[in-house]
A protein has these predicted regions:
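Surface-exposed extracellular loop regions of Gram-negative outer-membrane beta-barrel proteins
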Residues: 76-83, 87, 93, 98, ...
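Beta-turn initiation residues at beta-strand->coil junctions
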Residues: 1-8, 12, 18-25, 31, ...
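Short, low-complexity export/processing leader segments characterized by acidic and small residues
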Residues: 312-313, 331-333, 363-373, 377-378, ...
Length: 526
């Protein structure tokens, strides 16, 4: 298998500044990241003369994003946000087309009016079930938010709540929640035009029989990461690094090695597994956002929107080879190029072209109905709208693992954990402490430093303030930071030693600067 070496470089504040991918043959792929004083990414410069720029409002929301190469202008959008931090409108800077969004009283996304004047509804009812019509009459739901019927299909489930049949045939069961089981004497077989779903005992999707009769099968490891997909005589294999897919390849199923179990119970592969059509995905360090696709010696740069969703891909010559927008369900629209050239959708989701389902680690999401096809494995702890529902607003929120809505986590703590762990692994700085108290005489009781670090190069101590999801410092915090930066702050008695072993307790902050790190929600790991 081809070895790709991905290297990450950081600035003196411990922030990612460069990504380099080298496979030993051909040119390297690179990304350079330029930030503003708050640590927000304002420009990215990629191999092939590709650039992406962003501007932000005072709350950290992206208000414009543009990409271009030496050959052509690319993605150009202007964003407007309402007082609640919800996306209000998007204007295409090239065509002038405008998309506007509407929300209900609790902030759930209800609809979009696209640039061509068409309306797309995602109308939630009081329990969180969503409908594609304004009057909410196009669907019928059962317990827990399972969809029973829409304008095209009936949906049938097993006793565990997993979807087992999506069929255009009507009235196949009289069960109030469309449950079908052998025990109850109701077993319905697949017919042409149906989608049939089979499940493993642990709740993972095993296979899907498509309307024309072919079957897609899936395999997983013990962590729920999909390792293989089998379809139409081909094996599609996946390799993971933690929670992100880093490589995939395919070959003919007839060439797949057999497995055996030795006398110690170990699984052995008989022969070498073929590796053909290898694709390598490159991510920014610590995130789920893909930034490059490496295939057959070609290097493709991936541009993502303010949420981290892919919206554009360039080849190494600076030509746009893929581009897309998203609808209110997270499905693609305005597609240019081959749909599955970039298979990533909402963060944590990978689209299967055969089924049009999004693999979302522990569940599969159907963007055509806006629901998962099985119940949340952690049930009510997931805090999603229903047991089958996706997030309330896919313009802002996401569900990385098909378990829970990211915004329902303690964002500040998660952001601090991310930056703290990043800094621990940064060889250019020493982490002195976390939640270190600094007194600010004359301005309140002082403040805590989220993370206190010291640069190995300059010896300067940096008070790192961490914000998540566009949060900003209060006026009081800014005043205290100004005092700290001017040397007027005093380290409290719980202060650590500096990297030379000198106690900082009761010392003035004469060698300290304050720095804000704003972590977008999509860069926060679970």
């Amino acid at each position: 298998m081809s070895q790709l070496v991905v290297q990450y470089s950081f600035d003196e504040d411990g922030l990612l500044s460069r990504v380099t991918a080298a496979n030993g043959g051909g040119e390297n792929w690179e990304e350079e990241i330029i930030r503003d004083s708050e640590g927000l990414k304002i420009e990215k410069i990629f191999s092939g003369g590709i650039r992406m720029t962003r501007t932000y409002d005072a709350y950290g929301n992206v208000i414009s994003q543009k990409s271009r190469s030496f050959r052509q202008d690319g993605y150009d959008r202007r964003y407007a946000w309402n007082a609640s931090g919800r996306l209000q409108s998007v204007i295409d800077g090239i065509t002038g087309g405008r998309t506007s969004y509407a929300y209900d009283a609790v902030g759930s996304l209800m609809s979009a009016r696209y640039e061509d004047g068409t309306d797309d509804y995602r109308m939630p009812d009081a329990t969180g079930n969503v409908f594609r019509s304004r009057d909410r009459r196009d669907r019928e739901y059962g317990k827990g938010g399972r969809i029973l019927r829409d304008r095209h299909y009936d949906f049938l489930y097993d006793v565990e709540g997993n979807l087992i049949l999506k069929t255009p045939r009507r009235g196949l069961t009289q069960h109030p929640n469309h449950e079908v089981s052998e025990e109850s004497g109701t077993h319905i077989v697949w017919q042409t035009g149906d989608y049939a779903y089979e499940w493993y005992g642990n709740g993972m999707l095993k296979e899907v029989r498509l309307p024309y009769g072919k079957t897609v099968r899936f395999e997983y490891d013990a962590l729920g990461r999909r390792t293989a997909k089998l379809f139409n005589g081909h094996v599609f294999r996946y390799l993971w690094d933690g929670n992100v897919m880093v490589q995939e390849w395919q070959y003919e199923e007839k060439d797949r090695p057999q497995y055996s179990i030795d006398e110690f119970g170990r699984i052995r592969m008989q022969g070498e597994e073929p590796v053909e059509n290898l694709v390598t995905w490159v991510y920014e360090e610590g995130s789920y956002v893909p930034v490059a696709k490496i295939q057959n010696g070609e290097r493709y740069t991936i541009i993502s929107d303010y949420m981290g969703r892919p919206v554009e891909a360039y080849n190494s010559y600076g030509n746009v080879v893929w581009q897309a927008d998203y609808d209110v369900y997270g499905d693609l629209r305005n597609i240019k190029g081959i749909r599955d050239f970039i298979p990533f959708r909402q963060l944590g989701q990978y689209e299967d072209d055969e089924t049009r389902l999004y693999y979302n680690r522990f569940r599969y999401y159907d963007p055509r109905i806006g629901n998962y096809i099985s119940q949340d494995p952690i049930r009510l702890a997931g805090n999603n709208p229903t047991l089958y529902g996706y997030v309330e607003d896919c313009n802002k929120l996401f569900d990385l693992f098909g378990l829970d809505c990211k915004a329902n986590k303690k964002q500040g703590t998660l952001a601090e954990d991310k930056i703290y762990n990043d800094l621990l692994h940064n060889s250019d700085v020493i982490v002195l402490g976390r939640q270190v108290y600094i007194k600010t005489p004359g301005i309140g009781r002082g403040r805590y430093s989220d993370v206190l670090i010291q640069s190995k190069k300059t010896g300067k101590i940096i008070n790192v303030e961490i914000k998540s999801g566009g949060a900003v410092r209060s006026t009081s915090q800014i005043k205290k930071d100004i005092l700290i930066n001017s040397g007027g702050g005093v380290f409290g008695k719980n202060a650590p030693l500096d990297m030379n072993g000198k106690p900082l307790a009761d010392m003035k902050t004469s060698n300290v600067t304050s720095s804000v790190r704003n972590v977008p929600l999509w860069e926060i790991n679970m």
